[in-house]
């Protein structure tokens, strides 16, 4: 199979185009496929806070493959063995949580690259990513099609942001508002003015460095604000939260004493 590996999501980010996404926490291929038919530019399949196994992630990648929505996998952490597995099952774009230093960022980059450029274990002939060895020259061309995004979500990470942005192989930086606000001393209050100021400044620094800037905003007005600040890959909802809101709203139409969905300002 003489196939050329491409990553349209990465190319659009490189051009500075805005990409609107949805967070998937439901852990099922069925729900992932429903989301893929909605037309979001990207879908974050969450392996950090949602109870996804490697097989769950694999099945969700299969489910969304026929559609235009680009899957992004967030593993529970950025270890070399786990990154190897996620890449082998066919993920082209990764979002790595809790990256606090440039050294961590370099280790993550190395874990995604085959030798001599990194430390990714070689197993293309048994991997979905290489169509079980049928994609010719997979190892030679895969680096250009990988998109690596890292999460900055602590005061330490903010202090090291410029150094992280200088790491070759990092395509974008995602601001994690929930953990960041807690780290700054404002737990469960990403809307605090000081947190908002830091988010705005960070987004602008990321874009000024030539990297893509990402954010998850479950409140539409916050999503619009981040877009105005320059964020260009923004998730505007979480499937499980949207589902629970819809259930509450429908029940409130028929049962007295029900007030509809509760207001959720953060993830």
From Swiss-Prot:
Function of the molecule: Catalyzes the reversible retro-aldol cleavage of 2-keto-3-deoxy-L-rhamnonate (KDR) to pyruvate and lactaldehyde.
Residues under site feature: Transition state stabilizer: 74
Record EC number: 4.1.2.53
Protein name listed in UniProt: 2-keto-3-deoxy-L-rhamnonate aldolase
Taxonomic lineage from the root: Bacteria, Pseudomonadati, Pseudomonadota, Gammaproteobacteria, Enterobacterales
Residues the record marks as site: Increases basicity of active site His: 88
Ligand binding (Mg(2+)): 153, 179
Active site: 49 (proton acceptor)
NCBIfam families linked: PRK10128.1
UniProt family annotation: Belongs to the HpcH/HpaI aldolase family. KDR aldolase subfamily.
GO molecular function per UniProt: 2-keto-3-deoxy-L-rhamnonate aldolase activity; magnesium ion binding
């Amino acid at each position: 199979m003489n196939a050329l590996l491409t990553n349209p999501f990465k190319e659009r980010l490189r051009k500075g185009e805005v990409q609107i996404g949805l967070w998937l926490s439901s852990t099922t291929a069925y729900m992932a496929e429903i989301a893929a038919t909605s037309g979001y530019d990207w879908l974050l399949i969450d392996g950090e806070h949602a109870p996804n196994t490697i097989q769950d992630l694999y099945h969700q990648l299969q489910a969304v493959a026929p559609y235009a929505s680009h899957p992004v996998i967030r593993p529970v952490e950025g270890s070399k063995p786990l990154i190897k597995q996620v890449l082998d099952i066919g993920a082209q774009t990764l979002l790595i949580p809790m990256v606090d230093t440039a050294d961590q960022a370099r280790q993550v980059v190395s874990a995604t690259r085959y030798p001599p450029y990194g430390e990714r274990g070689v197993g293309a002939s048994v991997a979905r990513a290489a169509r079980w060895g049928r994609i010719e020259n997979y190892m030679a061309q895969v680096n250009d099609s990988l998109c690596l995004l890292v999460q900055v979500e602590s005061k330490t990470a903010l202090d090291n942001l410029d150094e992280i942005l200088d790491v070759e192989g990092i395509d974008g930086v995602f601001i994690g508002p929930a953990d960041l606000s807690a780290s700054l001393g404002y737990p469960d209050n990403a809307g605090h003015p000081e947190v908002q100021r830091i988010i705005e400044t960070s987004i602008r620094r990321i874009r000024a460095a030539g990297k893509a800037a990402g954010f998850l905003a479950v409140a539409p007005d916050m999503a619009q604000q981040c877009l105005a600040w320059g964020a260009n890959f923004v998730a505007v909802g979480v499937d499980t939260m949207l589902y629970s809101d819809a259930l509450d709203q429908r029940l409130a139409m028929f049962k007295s004493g029900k007030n509809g969905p509760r207001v959720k300002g953060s993830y």
